[in-house]
Amino acid sequence: MSNTFTQLYVHVVFATKVRMNLIKPEYQKQVYEYIAGIIKHSGSHPILINGMTDHVHLLFRYKADCNLSSLVRDIKSGISGHINKNGWVAGKFEWQSGYGAFS
């Protein structure tokens, strides 16, 4: 499909398990940078990543052949592992199941 051009933008929102305030300001920047890396690795382009202590907002341009559900799964899984590995929360960090996506 050499004559095809797409620009697909999506706003994704997801929250911590039971909306607990676990994404502390001390490491929010590192969390957002890690998420940006996962998005870039997928071939998509992060535009803005931000949030609060209990949820995250992502705005990115994604490739037409990108599976959004798989990408969000990879982001949530990757950042959970990163937070747990660094010991930034007492106990186990988890996300709520599901997400919102708007284009």
Briefly describe each language-model feature range.
Residues M1-S103:
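Basic nucleic-acid-binding interfaces
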